[in-house]
Amino acid sequence: MRTGAREAQLLAAPHVPAGLSQLGIVRPCDRLVAFADDFVDAFASGFDCCDVALVGSPSAEAFAAASEGFDASFDAEGPHLWWFVNSIGGFGLRVPDLRALGRAAREAHALFVVDNTVASAFGCDSQRLGAALSLEALDRICAGDAPRKLVAVSVARSQLKRHRVDAAAECAHALLEGCGLAKLELTANEAGVLDRGLDSLDVRMQAHFDRARALAEYLAANEMVRNVRYPGLSSHPDHAIATGILEHGFGPAVEFDLIERSSGELFDALPGEFRTSPAGGATTRLSAPSGKQGNTIRLFAGTDDPLVVASVLDNALRKLATL
């Protein structure tokens, strides 16, 4: 939801892949290349009409290899090649080099789409870095108070320096304009929640980011967990890239693995609000991206006191260790 975007639309959708599918701009003759190993089912069910290739790395080389042999075009008629990544996402909370991907996408005549949900527009200006189309689920923008799930879609400006036109952005604009999607009518309550969320966005997002850093540092020093993944830690494989891609910090999410315990066991040892609080709200929230039988935990920092959160986590982990 950048003010510098050419245009923006709102959709009612549970998440970004569903929103992209709902737009209807990815057509049966197209190829969609995506790095989204934590969202495989959404791509399998939402884009069964087209050729979907899921890559194992968010690198430009992996996307180029998966695009070989496809004759893509920036003409509105297509066929179109789509490249999809998260600014922060996938198992391990990977941070792709959006600049390199944006350049490579244009060389391959691919329409570069970025899911900016985790970082948000506050934490990553994906269109400045090369995205033709940016989508963002608005849970955190709305502070967890939205009555229904909303996704924002924005198209990059096609006018570049020295009067050059970005053919990818122009194509994305034409496709969005021609999709025939009716304008989403917000209720007065929804409009109020969105307006209040935008007014307080910068302060709240900075708080989310700062608390995530504090909790990541606590977890990295905790012997009861392992493999802490957070782009702000020097141990993260994309740390160097993240410093040039993300803004105001390294996002609100931290991922880690339990030692010989399952995610479900940790959830049982924690107060219920860590699981039931609204996504994007003030309370720190945990999820299990590999399922409750797996051992991976993904933490989304709220605006609550990180010392209290760390203490509750510590007590739960110690309880698990005695079982």
Indicate where each model-derived feature is located:
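Conserved PLP-enzyme active-site core in the AAT-like
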Residues: 2-221
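Conserved C-terminal alpha-helix-loop-beta "cap" of PLP-dependent enzymes
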Residues: 220, 224-322
